[in-house]
């Protein structure tokens, strides 16, 4: 069954409050989203495997631990998920980046695919899917399904704010996928937006609707 981890570090909570504030402009919003993603990356990557390696310091030879095993792929759900990639890459610069393009039909509220490009070795990588908002869960479910169809086996979902309905939907559809979020909001409005949420993350990141 999926594990849901809410990351409540004081720095994350502070920056998330600024992200939620409607007075925060696109420039600051982008920077804050990237910063929160970088802070969350510490917890999201906690279980990456390490191995002992021999190195030489200026003083002597010694044994240290470095990442081993499967490499990482960060896969944003376009377009809003792109805002979290920079923060992840600052801590995992060797990660490859895939892209899944989905948009929400404003009438049906269901996701529609328009783009998919992934690393060829996606099945050999630890995959971190990024999307600031987990609302109905439809986009995340479809993105994870696409990844599995391409061979991905180890997938985690990382978001800034998750609605309880979205968490329930994803855990039921993909019980093997762990979810990491900075906040859990209780409800969705009639338009499928998280309440209180932060509005439309893509619009606020890029200043376009």
UniProtKB/Swiss-Prot annotation:
InterPro entries in the cross-refs: PRibTrfase_dom, PRTase-like, Upp_B, UPRTase/APRTase, Ura_phspho_trans
Cofactor note: Binds 1 Mg(2+) ion per subunit. The magnesium is bound as Mg-PRPP.
Function according to Swiss-Prot or TrEMBL: Catalyzes the conversion of uracil and 5-phospho-alpha-D-ribose 1-diphosphate (PRPP) to UMP and diphosphate.
GO biological process: UMP salvage; uracil salvage
Binding-site list for 5-phospho-alpha-D-ribose 1-diphosphate: 79, 104, 131-139, 200
Keywords for this protein: Allosteric enzyme, Glycosyltransferase, GTP-binding, Magnesium, Nucleotide-binding, Transferase
CDD domains noted in UniProt: PRTases_typeI
This protein's pathway: Pyrimidine metabolism; UMP biosynthesis via salvage pathway; UMP from uracil: step 1/1
GO molecular function: GTP binding; magnesium ion binding; uracil phosphoribosyltransferase activity
Family according to the record: Belongs to the UPRTase family.
Residue positions binding uracil: 194, 199-201
Protein name per UniProt: Uracil phosphoribosyltransferase
Cofactors: Mg(2+)
């Amino acid at each position: 069954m999926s594990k849901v981890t809410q990351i409540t570090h004081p720095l994350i909570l502070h920056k998330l409050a600024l992200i939620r504030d409607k007075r925060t402009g696109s420039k600051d919003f982008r920077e804050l989203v990237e910063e929160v993603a970088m802070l969350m990356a510490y917890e999201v990557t906690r279980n990456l495997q390490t191995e002992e390696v021999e190195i030489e310091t200026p003083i002597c030879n010694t044994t240290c631990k470095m990442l081993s095993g499967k490499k990482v792929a960060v896969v944003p759900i376009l377009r809003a998920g792109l805002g979290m990639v920079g923060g992840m890459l600052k801590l995992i610069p060797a990660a490859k980046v895939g892209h899944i393009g989905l948009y929400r039909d404003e009438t049906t509220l269901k996701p529609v695919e328009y783009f998919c490009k992934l690393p060829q070795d996606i099945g050999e990588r630890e995959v971190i899917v990024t999307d600031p908002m987990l609302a109905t869960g439809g986009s995340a479910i479809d993105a994870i399904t696409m990844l599995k169809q391409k061979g991905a086996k180890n997938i985690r979902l990382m978001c800034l704010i998750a609605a309880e309905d979205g968490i329930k939907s994803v855990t039921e559809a993909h019980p093997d996928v762990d979810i990491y979020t900075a906040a859990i909001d209780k409800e969705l409005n009639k338009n499928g937006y998280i309440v209180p949420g932060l509005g439309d993350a893509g619009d606020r990141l890029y200043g376009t609707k």
